[in-house]
Amino acid sequence: MARSLAAVLLLLVAAAGASHAASPAEMYWKIALPTSPMPGAIRDLISPASSVGSASKEDTVGNVFFLEKDLFPGSKMTLHFTRATAGAALLPRGRAESVPFASERLPEILSQLSIPAVSPTADAMWSTLAECEAARLAGETTKHKHYCATSLESMVEFVASSLGTRDVHAVSTEVISTLTPTPRQAYRVEAVRPVAVPGGDMVACHGMPYAYAVFGLHGLKGAGGGRVPRGRGRARRGGGGIQEARRGARERGHLPLPASGRHDLGAQLN
């Protein structure tokens, strides 16, 4: 049965854009997701400045929760937008698959990546591995799929499989602050533009602390999306937003990410 599907990938991330010659990862993106330019937040993770070996100390989720009723021109809210796995490299699939990704093999992983066993990075990596394994054990439901992507290719394939389409448009927030960690501060919303998501499906994605870029992906149903073209505040300019029908607090470090779609693929790469 043929039907037109369009997806919006809400990459709620904090990163500044950069321009350079097309890399193999960018070429892959153009082929795999031809209808969407690669967001600067992803491009930054494949740039030469990115590296393997240290997990960001910045909270990768931040304080980004708000209610739909509070999102209107002139409204004020205090939020914390963080960078996407700051400084961590997004590995090619071949390289990522050559490194184990299991808590029981953490000593081997640390040895391969030359990371001290007693270090903040090792602790952060163990926490991420444990969270990914707990999600796998919990299994999938009709409303929620979870996957930890260790490469650009695995992230894109999960998105396309979850939504049943490669017709994806990526949207990202942008943080212009040079401070590390990024500041938690007050914003005033200047404009809001809804994003049509008639299919009701979305994949949300957020960065996870690790020695290289790892993203938690959540295939979900039942949320709406919107864009906030401008929000007054020194650290942020523009971005995407998602509102979920089920409002809940973060539980054991899990972000209650929503999903909705024109098929709306919401990825919070934070």
Swiss-Prot record:
Keywords recorded for this protein, A-Z: Signal
Cited Pfam families: BURP (PF03181)
Keyword Signal included in the entry's annotation: yes
Tissue: Expressed in leaves and shoot.
Region feature (Disordered): 225-270
Source organism superkingdom: Eukaryota
Signal peptide (from-to): 1-21
Compositional bias ranges of the Basic and acidic residues kind: 244-254, 261-270
Domain BURP: 65-270
Protein name: BURP domain-containing protein 1
